[in-house]
């Protein structure tokens, strides 16, 4: 016996989802991560049915390998690895952490600054992974948005270390305790099987801590604005100066 939902309920669900995704860039990026994981899953299933490793082909192009297998020409993998995940629980944990860390930081920053730090954290974590893998060439390819999530968490911690957080919805602790626990786990896991992932976590955390007091560096400006934008204010000042000179000249003539 199947269940069928009225079309009106289906439309409401779709509209609510669209509204939620548009409410915040953080929500939108959660949607991106879920969509990418859905693509991974579809390719895995299709590959299994056709006896072709389609997901492996995707990962070879998008995941971030260790230095020994990484080519500088694939520079985009320093970012794109953050859109992929090893499994559903990996995705779920990062999405939940992104939601809460992102909204905590939005207390102090703009929506755009939060998302840009998330992406910077992913890139910084990727760079740390590639560099340290010089001494650990056997690391598995890196995937996951954890470095970006930790960047947000550390930035929020630097802005407000005593912000109350409820662990498991019960235990009230300051935010710095949560960050300290996660950093300890990453440091303790450096020599473990996921040492490369822990290095990326610490790289993202470092980016969040450094930029935590300098969100202005995450404020957008285009190359066009940075190169030519200063001319407009000068022109306005010059025009106002000429107008003022003309007025003063008229006043002097009148007496």
Residues covered by each model-derived region:
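A detector for small-residue-rich transmembrane helices and their helix-helix packing motifs
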Residues: 2-251
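Short, Lys/Glu-rich amphipathic helical modules
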Residues: 254-255
């Amino acid at each position: 016996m199947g269940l069928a939902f009225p079309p009106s309920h289906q439309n409401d669900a779709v509209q609510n989802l669209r509204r939620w995704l548009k409410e915040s860039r953080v929500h939108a990026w959660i949607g991106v991560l879920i969509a990418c994981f859905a693509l991974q899953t579809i390719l895995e299933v299709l590959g299994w049915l056709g006896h072709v490793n389609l997901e492996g082909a995707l990962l070879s192009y998008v995941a971030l390998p260790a230095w020994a297998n990484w080519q500088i020409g694939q520079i985009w993998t320093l970012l794109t690895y953050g859109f992929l995940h090893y499994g559903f629980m990996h995705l779920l944990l990062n999405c939940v952490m992104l939601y809460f860390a992102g909204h905590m930081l939005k207390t102090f920053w703009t929506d755009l600054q939060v998302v840009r730090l998330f992406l910077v954290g992913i890139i910084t974590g990727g760079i740390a992974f590639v560099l340290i893998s010089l001494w650990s060439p056997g690391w598995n390819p890196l995937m996951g948005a954890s470095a970006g999530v930790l960047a947000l968490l550390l930035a929020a911690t630097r802005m407000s270390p005593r912000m109350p957080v409820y662990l498991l919805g019960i235990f009230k602790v300051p935010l710095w305790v949560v960050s300290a626990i996660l950093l300890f786990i990453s440091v303790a896991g450096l020599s473990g099987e996921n040492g490369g992932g822990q290095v990326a976590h610490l790289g993202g955390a470092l980016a969040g801590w450094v930029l935590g007091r300098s969100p202005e560096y995450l404020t957008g400006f285009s190359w066009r604005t940075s190169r030519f934008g200063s001319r407009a204010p000068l022109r306005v000042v010059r025009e106002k100066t000429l107008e003022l000179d003309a007025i003063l000249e008229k006043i002097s003539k009148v007496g």
